[in-house]
Amino acid sequence: MNVILAHDSEDKSPVIFETTPTYANLFGTIQRAYDARGGWTSDFMDLRAGSLLRADGGFLIMYSLEALSEVGVWRALKRTLNHNRLEIQPLEMFYPFGGSAQKPEAIDINVKVILIGDRSLYELLYEYEEDFRKIFKVRVEFDEEMAMSD
């Protein structure tokens, strides 16, 4: 058995700030090693949790433009948040000649994602991306400068 992540039931809700929302960093991955026969291998001990799983039961915070700029991230993020199920997959694009990889079962997750971005990007996504409206129902605005209070 490989426990890729354990949350104590008495722990507070995790808050994860993902500064580099690559596919592997967000969704996790299955690492592979080059073996003596010249192929790529992996087993259940090679599963690595991503930010979404580490934030399970809590909050994941990231910059919206960073997430939108990474290949495959936006589509997978929408799918994951729409179904509340996370699939950890190997990054096949980096291992085009890899052997058979592990295919773990999808994991039920409960995570709230907070995207940080400017108003124009929000309005663009809200107008043209139907799933964005369903997933991100609340918009919060802060001033760039705020007075310090006691």
Language model segments and positions:
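Conserved ASCE/P-loop NTPase catalytic core
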Residues: 1-127, 131-149
